[in-house]
Amino acid sequence: MSEAEARPTNFIRQIIDEDLASGKHTSVHTRFPPEPNGYLHIGHAKSICLNFGIARDYQGLCNLRFDDTNPVKEDIEYVESIKRDVQWLGFEWSGAVRYSSDYFDQLHQYALELIGKGLAYVDELSAEQIREYRGTLTSPGKNSPFRDRSVEENLALFEKMRLGEFAEGSACLRARIDMASPFIVMRDPVLYRIKFAEHHQTGNKWCIYPMYDFTHCISDALEGITHSLCTLEFQDNRRLYDWVLDNISIPCHPRQYEFSRLNLEYAIMSKRKLNLLVSEKIVEGWDDPRMPTISGLRRRGYSAAAVREFCRRIGVTKQDNNVEMAALESCIRDDLNENAPRAMAVLDPVRLVIDNLAADSVQLLTMPNHPSKPEMGNREVPFARELYIDRADFREEANKQYKRLVLGKEVRLRNAYVIRAERVEKDADGEITTIYCSYDADTLSKDPADGRKVKGVIHWVSASHALPAEFRLYDRLFSVANPGAAEDFLSTINPESLVIRRGFVEPTLAAAVPEVTYQFEREGYFCADIRYSSAGHLVFNRTVGLRDTWAKAAL
């Protein structure tokens, strides 16, 4: 990770600075605690950059801890993908990977302690009844008829739960707090529920599993976390976080702080809705390049540095807001414009023949891999009598604003010669099949000797040397800025989110490596697809265009 990446400031860092200055803490210890029930998305990237970035900048520690308390929804596949995503973003966790399930024995003991203090009880209301008894924001809840069981009875019943003697859903352990609390989260929340499911870490050892709010705070305390950072939807949960730690025998009491989550326009962040996109085959998987998942962004050709820069630019605040997709794409363009090697590709080819060049003539032209970075070296690209240019780069007639090839006029071929269009050949439908040109042999990368002005420049590939390729032109998956607000978010799918074209690339791209993004000159940024591209079948994903076309469309 570059040292040039500016260290941001925000209200959380100000709190940390004050804690260190006052001596409240002598070091900083954070954690990133994802649930392994899906793939991480760009919103998680913000949390990763915040937690790991703070640990890095304060020479502290950051744990990677999987909140694996629901075996029904979790899978080792997600565990491995999350580890890859964190490392791809440029971070390493402190020590071994941790799991909430590592603490199941301690959590069970703390549950027994709460029961022993009369602060937890086994409830046999159904889930629906618990919801009814909980009340609303404007009306208090009411006590469960099982709330006043004795400590001895609750201990015995909780043991029966642990031994699997209750059916799933027939009993749970609840905290005994206040059913009239103005905060619904404090109205006797569930601490443990029964699930007869094999766990990816603990197997079948347990059939009772702790809830997030009980697990999260205790895991933080056991690991010595100093600053527990969550998104704003957990703000009310902080009261329960503190209540649990205040009522058990544990020496460490971390403090929870909340920050705004990332809401990105033209995207969905809900795991449930993302899962629906996958299950309904709207996209081809969690790593589909149109998905906001980190694996999808990586496959599309986004760089880790650009994602980190995006997270830095949007900052950390306490106010929820929607971030424009253009802000993310701007970070990608800035990074790739600076670092992506250049190459030429023709996405909609039409044949071009240079009449005054010998049929067997082949010239290797030296071209820079980057126009402003000589340290990136050069490449040799063959130039021959027959070329392909993009169909949009030729017109039989055009006005003065059209700076490309026009019949009877000149244009420059990128890093090559000036050519003049002399005539065209068409098929029976009137479609141009071949453009016949002449070239000025004295104009290789220089102006014509007679001083005539040639303003336009177009890209090209040699027809006999170019490699056939498939181009996947990815765009925003949704056609509206806030698809989540729609009654049926699937109705807002952009039908043009994927357009496939077939054309040609210069031969230097034969060994294009997935996740290495190129600027295809005048076309955009592309990378070889990790799933489908091979030496015999090149497939390139468009990472992002050279400019924001959506801004124009909105005008």
UniProtKB/Swiss-Prot annotation:
Please state the Enzyme Commission number of this protein: 6.1.1.18
**Cleaved signal peptide residues:** none
Q: Which InterPro entries match?
A: aa-tRNA-synth_I_CS, Gln-tRNA-synth, Gln/Glu-tRNA_Ligase, Gln_tRNA_ligase_bac, Glu/Gln-tRNA-synth, Glu/Gln-tRNA-synth_Ib_cat-dom, Glu/Gln-tRNA-synth_Ib_codon-bd, Glu_tRNA_lig_a-bdl
> What's a Pfam family this protein contains?
tRNA-synt_1c
Q: What GO annotations for molecular function exist for this entry?
A: ATP binding; glutamine-tRNA ligase activity
User: Could you state one GO cellular component term attached to this entry?
Assistant: cytosol
Which stretch carries the motif 'HIGH' region?
34-44
Q: Where is L-glutamine bound in this sequence?
A: 67, 212
> What is this protein's name?
Glutamine--tRNA ligase
